[in-house]
Structure formats: C-alpha cells, structure tokens
Amino acid sequence: MSTKSKAYKAAAELVDRSRLYRPIEAAKLAKETSSKNFDATVDVVFRLGVDPRKADQLVRGTVSLPHGTGKDVRVAVFAEGDNAEAAKAAGADIVGTEELIAAINEGNIDFDVAIATPDQMAKVGRVARVLGPRGLMPNPKTGTVTADVTKAVADVKGGKISFRVDKASNLHAIIGKASFDAEKLAENYGALYDEIIRLKPSSAKGIYAKKITISTTSGPGIPVDASVEKNYTD
C-alpha cells in the first residue's frame, strides 16, 4: 500500500459514516483529515433534487464568500478603451479583446474567471466553444457581463464565486483552504448554503438538498447534515 493510500485510509477512519455532521464539525474534521503536505482546498458538493434537463430547474448563481476562497484568482477581462484601463486599475490579470481571443484559440487559457463588457460579447462569442465547456464563458446571470468592470473584478478577487448544478444534479463549489479557521469555513459554507436554498426552483418536488459532502483535496468525504440552517458555527 502506498504512503498516499495509507494516509487516506487513516484519514477516512476518522469519519463516522453512520452520522451526519453539523457544518462546524465537518469543517473541523476536514482540517483534521487534510494532507499535511500542502494547503488543500476545501470543497463542498450538494446533491440536489432537481432535473437539470429542465430549464426551470437549472440551479446556478453567484455568492460572495465572507472569507474568500483563499485562492489567488486570475481574472481576464474582455474590454477596450476606458473599460480596459478601469479593469487594469481594479487588478485584472489579463485585459484585452483580439489578443486575448487569439491566445485562447491557441490554447493559452491562463485565467480562472472571464469578465466582459456588453459591447465585447459579439467578439467573445468567437471563443464560446472553448470557454463554455470550461465554465469560463462570461454570462450576465453570474455578473460577468457588465459595464462596471471595476466592481466585477473586485467582487471576484474578493471571494465571489459562481456555481451551477451539473448533469448529474451535483453542485460543486470551493469554500476555502484547510488553513482557514473552522469557523471561517463554516461561515463560507453557510453563505453558499443559504444562496442555494434561496434558489430552489418552485417546480422542484421532494427533498431539495438530498446530500451534502465536504472534503479537502484528496481527503475523505464528510457527510453534512443538510437540515442545519443558520448558526453554522455552532
């Protein structure tokens, strides 16, 4: 058995599969079961009671995590003129249009989030088939198509994340790093949970949040009590 699998097995044995953990308990356990070799990302997966094939049940949105993600998010902005200057001043990592499109077509996608001003969307459409499957296509619904690039860049850099349910009805998101205090992880989780619950489609029947799991990179999944609302740090 490899050292990695031994470490995973030891970590997995700390998780009681017969129970559901409160968010703060899951956050503490995620930190405890995380790799000690690097600062792992803490992820959460929601299994939702929706049918993503139906347009009115495609749960997607954005939320600003109160403590950010702990990740250095690289932002690309499709803009020209004054908007391009504003994006640069706000801290965007890559700004441009034609040169950015050319780089994308060459396979150089060195960013985590793409933002575009409305007047550039016709041009951005030329790389939609590249950006779309990667979840990088700017979209008005996520606030990434906007004339206010200063605010958009600041929001993303400050911890605003986008989420979307996938074809298997799972919704994945990052809520921080293993180095975060457990309370901060729980509060980030709570902000995400509240927004997902708020977005429950009226046509979705039965249990909405069927299953929630928190884990770190390469760490075991920790089942979370989906009935816990508010008081996430208790």
From Swiss-Prot:
CDD domains hit by this protein: Ribosomal_L1
Record Pfam families: Ribosomal_L1
InterPro entries registered for this protein in UniProt: Ribosom_uL1_bac-type, Ribosomal_uL1, Ribosomal_uL1-like, Ribosomal_uL1/biogenesis, Ribosomal_uL1_3-a/b-sand, Ribosomal_uL1_CS
One cellular component term from this protein's GO annotations in UniProt: large ribosomal subunit
Top-level taxonomic group: Bacteria
Swiss-Prot/TrEMBL GO biological process terms: regulation of translation; translation
GO MF entry, a single one: structural constituent of ribosome
Protein keywords: Repressor, Ribonucleoprotein, Ribosomal protein, RNA-binding, rRNA-binding, Translation regulation, tRNA-binding
Subunit annotation: Part of the 50S ribosomal subunit.
Family classification: Belongs to the universal ribosomal protein uL1 family.
Function according to Swiss-Prot or TrEMBL: Binds directly to 23S rRNA. The L1 stalk is quite mobile in the ribosome, and is involved in E site tRNA release. Protein L1 is also a translational repressor protein, it controls the translation of the L11 operon by binding to its mRNA.
Name this polypeptide is given: Large ribosomal subunit protein uL1
Organism of derivation: Corynebacterium aurimucosum (strain ATCC 700975 / DSM 44827 / CIP 107346 / CN-1)
